[in-house]
Amino acid sequence: MSAGWRSWTGRPGGPGSAYGRLSPVQQSRPGYGGLRPGGLRPGGLRPGALRSGGMRPRSLWHRALARQSFLRHLDWALMLGVLGLSLLGTLLIWSATQHGLARAGGDPQTYLKKQLLNVVIGLILMAAVSSLDYRMLRIYAPVGYAITSIGLLVVLSPLGSIVNGAHSWIALPGGFQAEPSEFAKVTLILMVALILSELRDGDRRPRPRDLAAALACGALPLGLVVAQPDLGVLILMVAVLVGMIALSGIRLRWLAGLGAVTALAALVTWSLHLLKPYQVQRLTAFLNPSADPRGTGYSAAQAKIAIGSGGMFGQGLFHGSLVAGNFVPEQHTDFIFAVAGEELGFVGAIVIIGLIAVLLIRSLRIAVRADDQFGLLVASGIAIWFALQAFINIGMTIGITPVTGLPLPFVSYGGSAMFADMIAIGVLQAVHRRHSVFD
């Protein structure tokens, strides 16, 4: 074979080969841009094609290979769960809102368009985070934590707005609102993982000062959430914090002590009447649903009626009678699962639960296969978050958990929740891609 032909076959050393033009550092990177020695086959590229049009073929070639490599190393089973839930959620939101909007003389597709935009923006955020080396999140975590903490402070100022009795929102120009507590879930997980893994790449267990630092890190957002107050987010954050500490390798006696302190704090909160009256009423309504069926217990009672009326296969999408009459309060957000139960029936509800199970199984798999302790803790924290939030949301719809106002991940309407959920999926994909590329 002539030297001229060899230069265009992509073999190492050829002056015209793409591989030969890479720097020694680039050549040494495993899977750089998806390009390997011998990766360009004879006949696949012609010298004339590389020079035509005044383009930079090497950059285009590397960009195409990098894009192909990025897609190949995604966890597509995880993406199936996310896309399936997002699609079903968008349809259910449309069904839950179109009748009320039509009766009011508005556009029946208003919430459909908004949620589609939320999903698209969320997917863009997910792709951006997925493309990062997740170890760089060690650098970004403190910045994100500071920003979300400031946001939690702002909601308590005059810039914050009250929704359903809680100062959880920031009013933005154009009629938009942001809920910092949703993003605080992500940054809390990253910061706690950073603290508990910073010195854990060896075999040493976390020291008492590591545990104290993690608890102090959680205390700030937890205190600000209590001040709003948002009981659902508070329960979720405490569970995620305790779960991540438990998985960090902490000694059992410290874990038992932490559990005792958590239980004592809950008891003191209840005994000193630190909860708002409406929060106490929600808890008592859960314990005795028949105590106030037309007041505090109304939402949960109507949700159970809607689910029961769906039967095995449901009344059909867009044909739910209770949904059309808007008998279930907050049916496009907190009680979206009731819409699924009435219109899609038991089968549709099981499909949603199955997609959530796929998401959780893949998240745990990513955690187990993570390259380091930081990746394990981050993925585990996200798995705990999604599992508990889905359980609480579905549970309050069927009457086995109190009504707390937590949305169903990827299904309930909301921009802040969707963006935070998608960012979390991006972090999971980044952890997975790191393992997949170098496995």
Regions found by a protein language model. Give the residues of each.
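A juxtamembrane structural motif centered on a specific transmembrane helix
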Residues: S2-P37, R41, R46-P47, R51-L65, ...
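N-terminal anchoring/assembly modules that precede and organize ATP-driven motor systems
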Residues: M55-R56, L71, L78-M79
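Cytosolic juxtamembrane amphipathic/interface segments immediately preceding
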Residues: S59-H73, G106
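Helix-boundary and loop/linker segments of multi-pass membrane transporters
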Residues: Q68-R72, P206, D210-L211, G325-V328, ...
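Hydrophobic alpha-helical transmembrane segments of multi-pass inner membrane proteins, especially
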Residues: L78-S95, L101-S299, A338-I398, I423-V427
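Glycine/serine-rich anion-binding loops at beta->alpha junctions
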Residues: G174-A184, Q228-P229, G311-Q315, V403-A420
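Transmembrane helix boundary and interhelical junction motifs in multipass membrane proteins
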Residues: D230-I235, Q315-G320, Q331-T333, I350, ...
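TM-adjacent membrane-interface loops and short helices in multi-pass inner/ER membrane proteins
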Residues: A285-I336, F346-G348
